[in-house]
């Protein structure tokens, strides 16, 4: 059950090997935005598994989660 006082609680997680804190019950896209990332331009490994974009909105980060976030960069050959 959702408790409004619980929403102000901070949880600890690891993002790209660094300890971070965020609000409890934060959905993954909101976490990405709070980190200054464009959710449309990243890929996410969530606790050791690639998390498909279709599941991001329903995924709330939890205490102790481990995320690896990779920015997608277009490019080509530089000459």
Regions found by a protein language model. Name each.
Residues 1-79:
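Ubiquitin-like/PB1-type beta-grasp interaction modules and other compact soluble beta-rich domains
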């Amino acid at each position: 059950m959702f408790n409004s006082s619980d929403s102000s609680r901070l949880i600890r997680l690891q993002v790209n090997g660094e300890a971070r804190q965020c609000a409890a019950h934060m959905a993954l896209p909101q976490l990405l935005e709070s980190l200054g990332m464009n959710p449309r331009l990243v890929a996410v490994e969530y606790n050791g598994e690639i998390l498909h974009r279709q599941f991001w909105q329903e995924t709330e980060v939890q205490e102790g989660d481990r995320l690896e976030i990779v920015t997608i960069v277009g490019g080509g050959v530089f000459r």
